[in-house]
Amino acid sequence: MASLSPPDLGSVVHTAAEEADILMLQELVSIESLSRHESSAVAFLRGAMAARGFRVEQDAVGNAVGTIGSGERHIVLLGHIDTVTGHPPVKIEDGVLWGRGAVDAKGPLATFVAAASAAAADLKVKVTVVGAIGEEAIHSLGATEVANWPAPAFCIIGEPSGWDSLCLGYRGSLSLIYRLQTDMRHTAGPGESVAEQAVAFWNGVLAEVAARNEGAKNLFESIGPGLRSFNTSSDGLSETAELSIGLRLPPDLDVPELLQRVEALAGEGQITVDGMQEGYRTTKQSKLVPPFLRAIRDEGGTPRFKVKLGTSDMNVVGPNWKCPIAAYGPGDSSLDHTPEERIDLSEYLRAIRVLRNVLISFS
């Protein structure tokens, strides 16, 4: 890991514990951890948790796992340690930490570690923090492994909701590959080229989605189509078109029926499912909600509820565990995956205090 420049925290005076929490996040963000290349960050996180009194391990797929406290009830704080590509310089200026993962989602993950260790003396429950690998990849390998655990009493997903907000749901996703191969033809001859047929298929998908979205109350309840890539190739005898397609799915959508319709639109083309996560949503009546409302208000905030248009590991563990679940963490999610990714450290510290009080309330 590269040496870190001294942070510019502005005029704010922090306690020793707050400075340690800021340094932990800065160091974690400084370690590049693309999906499938998280081992260095996992090793750092395990060390940081061990230094704070966690019982640490690395599971079969490479997740960082740390447990603190004891009791009959088990609380899982499931964050992810991988990031998307791009590693802008890590710096702290005027109380703001810049760098890939500061928001999505090392900020929420560091919040989990800091809050659980701060609550340790008052815990009467077992709290497990997971720094999961592979969340930014299609198959969410880390969360898929964790989903095999016995269901906990509560689960909190580490994603940037904002310190004063709770996220109650995420759309799902369906990743598809469309492939069409035809015999070569002269461009002056009759008929459509393989590229033209692929375009016609994609336009058919857009029309199908538009028809299904009629009457949707909002974007969360609609299907979101995306064309990720379009490639054509030829070997002189045949020509091939391949499209990579992503569909964002609202909860309760009949995914097999939608897939059947897409396959019909493909005609002679082949459809391969490259990954699928169904949408998932909980309610304001969840037993997780009241402790967060109290803790946010105690910090001077006005609690808000959100649902997100993307996916998270809630989509993976929620259907398996069926326990009270929500996503929480500091940060502005509109900065996810952008060159401007950054987190206000005062918000980070506030989120730590909120989550600490939530964990103590379970005791």
Map each language-model feature to its residues.
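Short beta-strand/turn micro-motifs at beta-sheet edges
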Residues: 87-88, 164-168, 230-235
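Metal-dependent amide/peptide-bond hydrolase catalytic core
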Residues: 2-9, 57, 160, 174-363
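Hydrophobic/aromatic beta-strand patches that form the interior of the parallel beta-sheet core
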Residues: 75-77, 130, 154-156, 228, ...
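Acidic/histidine-rich catalytic neighborhood of metal-dependent amide-processing enzymes
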Residues: 110-175
